[in-house]
């Protein structure tokens, strides 16, 4: 029988792994088979770190050395239903805001989508109230001596809400699915440490079928269920942040039997949207509401809320009125509503505030003169009056920011912060050759047309920079889609822009590496600093306690080099009715509904 191209690839790849073929010979034969150079080069390099699955093959023992137990924190079993004052039939209503675009955990990207999916599914790991990795779908784990092989033991007796047992195969399917180029998930890059993950995810889904299959096979071998309760994941390199990634939605165990064959919108049929989380969906009316009932089989105990309702109201004014009328049990008000809330004794007494895990910055094109001079960027960073911005533009909501990392992040540092300093800003600009702004080219600061808040922000920056530095900045309106296209395509004509980052998981890598590290497309054009890259690359491979000093150095260096001028950290505002109790507070989350929603309960009345 004539062998297929795929079979030939498997054979020559196996020879390469065994050492029976040189890499040069592999590249030559792969090219003869029609495999692209980039993919062939990747497979050549991957041969030393991963095995491609072949039909009937037995798992190959990892060469990474004996594993040790992964330290996992505890989350107490204390469900709200067991509280003596809990209303057993409690109904809790929350506003979701806008209708979600997708409920698919391996695709979604927005907070409202996470809110919905987190009620239905349990991630492989969770985070406790100190933001430390804890057991969830996996009750324990080990990591190899070189930090590249994680082995998870799936919780015994865990089931989906329909009674079907949860297995390692379910988690393997879901995590692998998050790397599929066909699924095209928005957070696939969080899994790029997985051997073969980036190459498969970034492959053309319409490309050569044999090439795609080989790339997929590498990932299949990197993410595999050894048996019903044992999941093994192999990484290209030690990644100290990896346990944190295992606590986010990309690991939610969607079921293959409910997903495959039902199209990209499989989740819209609630019969398919079945998980192992604290609640199960009972109804969904698009643009109106989602209704959940508690999952009596939830592994952490019966949740304290009998019925959970998410309504969909986009107007913050309407939402606040509904809260005042008792239609919502909690809400997150807009910053602009703070004066109204503080003026109302009842609302003021129900308001809670905490630092938010987000940062805003003013970005400068580091390739465009004069912003290719570090002194110019530093001058702009020193010229921003952050306190005034928070007071005047942000209605007093937020914290002036001098670094990327927010207070409360484990690597937050105060060794070097960007601060408002008029004299220093003027001195730096003069050093760069523009004393008093003389000779400095006029710049446009684009903002979203017909958006009053965007215009107000741009006007503030223009006036602030003119007053301190004497430079001319012209606020210029632009259609939102056009402006977004400039940002997305990293158009070199975009000199100024504003940026922000909202935390996905509370590890410094999610900030310093993903946003400003090697290969990023989120940082301004021209920012690719070898010193910075070396710091974060080293830190990413270490356990967090060893990595923190390096991350702190990187955070300080980033602030000092000023590819952007940081100006604001976020702040959480939450209104909570007095009879809603049991919620767990995290460093940057006042009411946790993602990891410990089962503890929330409501008293009668």
Residue ranges and their predicted role:
Residues 80, 85, 217, 224, ...:
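Extracytoplasmic/peripheral linker and loop segments enriched in polar/acidic and small residues
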Residues 293, 372-463, 467, 553, ...:
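Append "and occasionally in soluble cytosolic enzymes with long acidic Gly/Pro-rich linkers
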Residues 129-132, 205-210, 216-218, 224, ...:
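Gly/Pro-rich hinge or "lid" segments in bacterial periplasmic/extracellular proteins
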Residues 574-605:
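Long beta-strand-rich cores associated with HINT superfamily self-processing modules
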Residues 95-145, 272-275:
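N-terminal lobe/hinge region of extracytoplasmic solute-binding protein
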Residues 1-25, 32-34, 39, 44, ...:
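N-terminal secretory signal peptides
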Residues 286, 430-503, 524, 544, ...:
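Ligand/substrate-recognition segments at binding pockets and active sites
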Residues 282-293, 303, 309-368, 387, ...:
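Extracellular/periplasmic solute-recognition and catalytic clefts
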């Amino acid at each position: 029988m004539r062998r297929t191209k795929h079979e030939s690839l498997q054979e020559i790849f196996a020879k390469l792994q065994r050492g029976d073929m040189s890499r040069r010979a592999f590249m030559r034969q792969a090219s003869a088979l029609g495999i692209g150079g980039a993919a062939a080069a990747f497979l050549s390099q991957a041969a030393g770190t991963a095995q491609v699955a072949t039909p009937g093959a037995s798992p190959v023992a990892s060469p990474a050395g004996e594993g040790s137990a992964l330290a996992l924190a505890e989350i107490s079993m204390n469900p709200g239903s067991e509280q003596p004052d809990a209303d057993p039939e409690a109904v809790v209503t929350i506003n979701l805001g806008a209708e979600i675009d997708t409920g698919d955990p391996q695709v979604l990207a927005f907070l409202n989508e996470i809110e919905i999916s987190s009620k239905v599914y349990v991630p492989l790991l969770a985070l406790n109230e100190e933001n430390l990795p804890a057991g969830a779908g996996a009750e324990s784990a080990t990591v190899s001596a070189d930090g590249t092989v994680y082995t998870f033991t799936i919780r015994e007796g865990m089931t989906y809400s329909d009674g079907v047992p949860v297995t390692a195969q379910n988690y393997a399917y879901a995590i692998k699915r998050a790397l599929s180029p066909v699924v095209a998930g928005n957070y696939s890059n969080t899994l790029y440490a997985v051997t073969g993950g980036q190459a498969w995810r970034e492959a053309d889904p319409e490309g050569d079928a044999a090439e795609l299959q080989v790339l997929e096979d590498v990932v299949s071998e990197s993410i595999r269920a050894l048996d019903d309760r044992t999941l093994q994941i192999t990484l290209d390199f030690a990644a100290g942040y990896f346990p944190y990634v295992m606590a986010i939605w990309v690991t939610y165990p969607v079921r293959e039997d409910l997903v495959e064959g039902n199209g990209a919108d499989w989740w819209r049929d609630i019969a398919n949207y079945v998980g192992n989380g604290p609640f199960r969906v009972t109804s969904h009316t698009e643009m109106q509401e989602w209704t959940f009932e508690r999952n009596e089989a939830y592994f952490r105990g019966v949740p304290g809320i009998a019925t959970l309702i998410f309504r969909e109201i986009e107007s913050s004014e309407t939402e606040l009125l509904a809260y005042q009328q008792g239609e919502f049990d909690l809400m997150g008000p807009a910053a602009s509503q703070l004066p109204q809330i503080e003026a109302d004794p009842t609302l003021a007494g129900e308001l809670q505030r905490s630092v938010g895990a987000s940062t805003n910055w003013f970005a400068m094109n580091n390739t465009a003169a004069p912003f290719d001079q570090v002194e110019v960027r530093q001058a702009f960073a020193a010229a921003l009056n952050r306190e005034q911005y928070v007071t005047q533009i942000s209605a007093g909501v937020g914290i002036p920011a001098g670094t990327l990392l927010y207070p409360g992040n484990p690597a937050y540092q105060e060794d070097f912060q960007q601060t408002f300093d008029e004299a220093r800003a003027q001195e730096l600009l003069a050093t760069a050759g523009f004393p008093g702004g003389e000779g400095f080219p006029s710049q446009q600061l684009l903002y979203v047309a017909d958006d009053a808040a965007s215009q107000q922000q741009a006007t503030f920056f223009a006036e602030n920079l003119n007053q301190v530095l004497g430079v001319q900045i012209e606020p210029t309106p632009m259609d939102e889609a056009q402006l977004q296209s400039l940002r997305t395509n990293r158009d070199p004509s975009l000199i100024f822009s504003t940026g922000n980052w909202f935390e996905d998981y509370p590890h410094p890598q999610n900030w310093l590496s993903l946003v400003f590290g090697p290969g990023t497309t989120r940082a301004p054009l021209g920012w690719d600093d070898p010193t910075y890259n070396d710091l974060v690359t080293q830190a990413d491979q270490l356990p967090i306690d060893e990595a923190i000093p390096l991350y702190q150095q990187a955070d300080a260096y980033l602030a000092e080099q000023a590819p952007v001028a940081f100006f604001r950290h976020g702040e959480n505002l939450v209104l909570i009715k007095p009879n809603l109790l049991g919620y767990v507070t995290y460093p940057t989350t006042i009411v946790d509904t993602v990891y410990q929603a089962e503890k929330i309960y409501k008293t009668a009345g």
